[in-house]
Every structure is written in C-alpha cells, then in structure tokens.
Amino acid sequence: MAENQAKKEQVHTVFQNISQKYDRLNNIISFEQHKVWRKHVMSTMNVQKGSKALDVCCGTADWTIALSEAVGSKGQVTGLDFSENMLEVGKQKTASLENIQLVHGDAMNLPFDDNSFDYVTIGFGLRNVPDYLSALKEMHRVLKPGGMVVCLETSQPTLPLFKQIYSLYFKFVMPIFGKMFAKSKEEYEWLQQSTFNFPDKQTLKGLFFEAGFNDIIVRSFTGGVAAMHLGYKENSSSKGD
C-alpha cells in the first residue's frame, strides 16, 4: 500500500511538471507513431454515434478528442486524469467541443456509477497507475454490460530485431530526450522505467481476464513496441445461456 502511494505521488509530480511539454515529448519519443496506432485502434472500435465514452488517464485529451468526433453531437465523452496540469492543457484543446467533460480523478477509484459507459479507453496511461488490476477492475465496473474496453499501451517487442533496437533506444536515446524535456533526473528516469517495466502483451491479457473482461483481442504495432487490448464486459442477458 505504501509502495503504491509512493508511486502515485511520484507519477503525479512527473506529469504536473511535464504537462506543457507532454504533447511534443510524446510525438518525439514515438516518432509520431502513437497517432497512427490510435487511428488503427479507433477503426477497430467502430464507435457508434450517440454513445457514452470514458477516457481514463486522458492526459492532454488527444484520445478524448478522437472519441468526441466518433460519438458525435448526441454522444458524450468524459476524460479523467489525476494531473490537474495535464487537464488544464486538455481543457484548452477541447474548449470548443461541447460533448466533452474533463474530470479530475483517480483511475483506481473512478467517480462514476456502475454500468455508466458504452466504451472505456486508456491510452499510454495504464503503465503509470500503481495497481494495474485495480484500474482494470474499476474500468470494468463503470462499463455497461456488453460495453467495450480498449487499452493502447507500450509493450515488449516480440521480434528479435525490434527487441535489440528497443533495448538500445531505452538505454541511449530516451535519456537524451528525457534530459531535454524533464526538469529532473527523477522525471526522465520514470519515463524510461514505466515503459520498460510494463508487462508484455500476454501478461496484460491475463490481467484483463482477471478483471472480468471477455473476448479479448490483442493486436501488436510496430514489431510489438505497442499493443492494443480490446475486450468486453459480459452482457447480463447472456448469463445463464
């Protein structure tokens, strides 16, 4: 418990400090591939007009904005993040979008009723949560029966060549970017550690099952450096079938 609290405070400090630089940093570190990956994921999701979506760990609201376009004017998207500074950047970007609400909150204790959303997403945020399973269980709780959960996150490469490149990148390139954008050694070290230590796609798939999701689809991107996990909450009408 104390370890989780320490991680929570560390991550909060990091994102409070890098909020103004986060979008640029994300573009540089991923070589703008995160935009390509998200487009693929949105295409797979096939979000329905008029639906309600929750974007957990929404950060500066990039995925929140994509969801708002997908649900249309009759839909509603809520973005949640625990960094007030990240949300401030997000609010500036979403000021003209009436179907978006940004909320300050904790991914491990979501301030929403059970069965509230048709879609729940989390993009490049799960690795920053102290307890992955707790966050996934909360996402399951607030998802409507039959609803879809989607996680887009860094992963551990599976192809040998990408494994070597990935390792070299994190040892030599990431520290340079970190020093350029982060205010302290602690901040850029966290950016490295949280990505490098995140579970591989099969381990994460197991956590999705443990959280209660079914019919999980896993898709790798760019040699496995990122992965999508898509699952569903059991439809109550199907119980007992």
UniProtKB/Swiss-Prot annotation:
Q: Which UniProt keywords apply?
A: Menaquinone biosynthesis, Methyltransferase, S-adenosyl-L-methionine, Transferase
Q: Which organism is it from?
A: Staphylococcus epidermidis (strain ATCC 35984 / DSM 28319 / BCRC 17069 / CCUG 31568 / BM 3577 / RP62A)
Q: Does the keyword Oxidoreductase apply?
A: no
| Pathway given in the UniProt record | Quinol/quinone metabolism; menaquinone biosynthesis; menaquinol from 1,4-dihydroxy-2-naphthoate: step 2/2
Gene Ontology BP annotations? menaquinone biosynthetic process; methylation
NCBIfam families found in the cross-reference section: MenG_MenH_UbiE (TIGR01934), PRK00216.1-4 (NF001243), PRK00216.1-5 (NF001244)
What Enzyme Commission number(s) appear in the record?
Answer: 2.1.1.163
- HAMAP family annotated for this entry? MenG_UbiE_methyltr
Give the matching PROSITE patterns: SAM_MT_UBIE (PS51608), UBIE_1 (PS01183), UBIE_2 (PS01184)
- Which Pfam families would you find in this protein's record? Ubie_methyltran (PF01209)
Provide the reaction this enzyme catalyses: a 2-demethylmenaquinol + S-adenosyl-L-methionine = a menaquinol + S-adenosyl-L-homocysteine + H(+)
Q: From the Swiss-Prot or TrEMBL record, what is one GO molecular function term?
A: demethylmenaquinone methyltransferase activity
The record lists S-adenosyl-L-methionine as bound by 60, 81, 106-107
Against InterPro entries, the record matches this protein to: SAM-dependent_MTases_sf (IPR029063), UbiE/COQ5_MeTrFase (IPR004033), UbiE/COQ5_MeTrFase_CS (IPR023576)
- Is the keyword Methyltransferase assigned to this protein? yes
What biological function has been recorded for the protein in this entry?
Methyltransferase required for the conversion of demethylmenaquinol (DMKH2) to menaquinol (MKH2).
Which EC class is the enzyme in?
transferase
Give the protein name, as stated in the record. Answer: Demethylmenaquinone methyltransferase
Q: Which family does the record claim for this protein?
A: Belongs to the class I-like SAM-binding methyltransferase superfamily. MenG/UbiE family.
